[in-house]
Each structure stands twice: as C-alpha cells, then as structure tokens.
Amino acid sequence: MQANDRPRTFHLTVAYDGTEYCGWQVQPEQRSIQSELERVIRPLAGRPVRVLGSGRTDAGVHAIGQVARCVLPVWKADTVALQRAINSKLPNDIRVKAVRETRERFHPIADATGKQYQYLVQVGGSRDPFANRFVNRVGGPIDHSAMQSAAAKFVGRHDFKAFQGTGAERPSTVRTIHSARWIPRVATGPTGAELEGEHWCFEIDGEGFLYNMVRNLMGTMLEVGRGKKSPNWIDEVLASRDRKMAGPTAPPQGLFLCRVDYPDEVFQVEEPDVIE
C-alpha cells in the first residue's frame, strides 16, 4: 500500500451557531450539525462517512471549539485543502476552523482530557435583536459576588448527580472541575456600539461534564444571584444528589462549547508500511 492510499483519520475543530439546528446529533426529519457535516464530507470520501463529535450539544447551543472525527478512505491532499473543501459546501452558520490528522484509533469522546464551556448572561437593559440568540437575558439586580462564591463551590472533585439532566444518564456522576468563575465583559452590537445592561460570562473548565450539567449549574447559580438562596446552598444540593433540589435548567442560547483538550499522542500519526 502506498502511504497516500491508506484511510486517514482527521480531527476537525468546528464552530457553529446552533440556533437553527436540533442540536449536534442526527435526528429524523431535522437539521443537525452532524448531518450537515456528513452531507458535505460524503462526496469527498466517495461513500457515506460517520462524523463523530466530542459530545452532544442541544438545540440552540453554540460551539467555538467542538471537535469531530472523520475517516476518509483516500485523501491525497493536505489538511488545509480538506478544510477548504468542507467549508465550501457548509451553510454559513457552520465552519470548520482547523483540520489535523490523527492516529487511526483517535476517538473524540474517549480521548478527551478536558473541556471548557462559557455561558453568556445579560443583566437588565433591553433585549438586543442581534445578540439575542447568543445570550441569556435576565432581570436584575444580580448579586455577582454571591454567584462568584457559588461558582467556587463547584471546583474540585464532586458528585454532580443533582445537576445531571434526564435522558443521558452516566454510570458515574463524579466529575472534576478545574476552574469556575464569572468574568465581566463588554458586549457590542454589529456596529460596535456597546449593548445595554451588564454583561457577564460564566467560564468553567473540567475533565468532563454530564448531560445538561452546565445549564443546570447556571440555573442554580442564578437562584443564588437573585437572593433566593445563599452560596452555601450549593453544598446541600451537591450532597443531595437529587436533581429536584437544584435550580432550573438555564436556556440554551447562552451556552458555548469553547474547547476540547487532547493529549499530544493523539496527533502522532502512524506511518504505514510502504510496498515498493
């Protein structure tokens, strides 16, 4: 076999506006991010290709750094050419930001060592028609110091069963969170004018997350920010392991999957035997 005739496995970094999609995963009779990528990559591969993502994002959730894997039976050009070929056929609200070749056995879920999510919140001010799909607007006032204290409660290794959404239960609900913090931000519209209200970003890094976990953490912290609960209530919710004890699920539109981390060895491509 010639080196350029072997199947090649690729790591795609994908960004998308999830507003018009049913989510990442293929669903019958609906548009999904996965189905759009598979539709575009199929003619490049000459056959149906399964595109596997690093995790499911729900309808309305966005990504800056989702990771997907695809295997092409024969691709003789470089990764830049593949990126351009895919992007030339994708709709405007999905883009492949980078393509890297990986080892054959690369798995975007099993090989991931960490993820980062951000959730954008607008406190007060009028709802902006352009930013509306990317931010959760809430009424004020909000106690940001209390929410910062609540966020700190999530850092470390905990059982997050109380924050697991229904429909995708995992055998273990224990996860390690490396950092969780609220960051003030300046938000601007298409013309560069600063938007009304206060704008905040909740940023969380961890080894992995349960289904709907970040949105459930958000809804719970907002209960604290509104003064309905104290930051110490978070300890009670974690200890309860009961979803009913936590706050409501926050809306999807403020959530972004920003980054998925992998060890360097994922990108160490095995050299095939070359038959002279």
From Swiss-Prot:
Catalyzed chemical reaction(s): uridine(38/39/40) in tRNA = pseudouridine(38/39/40) in tRNA
SUPFAM superfamilies, per database record: Pseudouridine synthase
InterPro entries per record: PsdUridine_synth_cat_dom_sf, PsdUridine_synth_TruA, PsdUridine_synth_TruA_a/b_dom, PsdUridine_synth_TruA_C, TruA/RsuA/RluB/E/F_N
UniProt keyword Glycoprotein, yes or no: no
EC number(s) reported in the record: 5.4.99.12
Active site: D58 (nucleophile)
One annotated GO molecular function: tRNA pseudouridine(38-40) synthase activity
Binding site for substrate: Y117
UniProt record, GO biological process: tRNA pseudouridine synthesis
Pfam families per the UniProt record, alphabetical: PseudoU_synth_1
Keywords associated with the record: Isomerase, tRNA processing
CDD domains per record: PseudoU_synth_EcTruA
Phosphoprotein keyword on record: no
Signal sequence extent: none
Subunit comment: Homodimer.
Primary role: Formation of pseudouridine at positions 38, 39 and 40 in the anticodon stem and loop of transfer RNAs.
Entry-linked NCBIfam families: hisT_truA (TIGR00071)
Family of the protein in this entry: Belongs to the tRNA pseudouridine synthase TruA family.
UniProt-recorded name of the protein: tRNA pseudouridine synthase A
Gene source species: Rhodopirellula baltica (strain DSM 10527 / NCIMB 13988 / SH1)
Name of the gene encoding the protein in the UniProt record: truA
